[in-house]
Amino acid sequence: MKKISNQINNERLWERHESLANFGLCEDGGVNRQALSIDDLNARKQIVKWLEKTNIKVFTDDISNIFFRLEGIDKKSPPVLIGSHLDSQPSGGKYDGVFGVLAGIEIIQTLSEKKIIPE
């Protein structure tokens, strides 16, 4: 098994953190991106836009949850799930919730780019 932690694109990960922090940005540097607000929905659209530029399957459900999938070798094996939330508390920190989402995206995108196919 290849080690991918050293292959993560740290610059892309940081730029995406900064980009998402602009959705609902407050004067104090925090965010107010409450669930299903315009800022939350726009952040979700940005996530989908990033993923549509890859070979990763992207889909949403009826309540705007975003799912992305990189097919593995064995289609019967259970998936690995990584996630978090894009919305924030009314006075959340700049990165409230987004790290888990962005970490999952960066991992799956790195696997895809490096042509590492999970079992």
Predicted segments, located by residue:
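N-terminal hydrophobic or amphipathic helices/low-complexity stretches enriched
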Residues: 1-29, 71
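General structural feature for long, well-ordered alpha-helical segments within catalytic domains
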Residues: 9-16, 39, 43-47, 78, ...
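Structural signal for hydrophobic packing residues in well-ordered secondary-structure cores
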Residues: 17, 21-24, 54-55, 108-115
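A non-catalytic alpha/beta surface segment that caps or lines the substrate-entry region
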Residues: 25-71
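Short acidic, glycine/proline-rich loop/turn micro-motifs
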Residues: 31, 92-94
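Short coil/turn connectors at secondary-structure junctions
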Residues: 54, 75-80, 117-119
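Glycine/charged-rich beta-loop-alpha catalytic/anionic-binding loops adjacent to active sites
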Residues: 78-91
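Alpha-helical metal-binding/catalytic segments enriched in His/Glu/Asp
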Residues: 82, 94-119
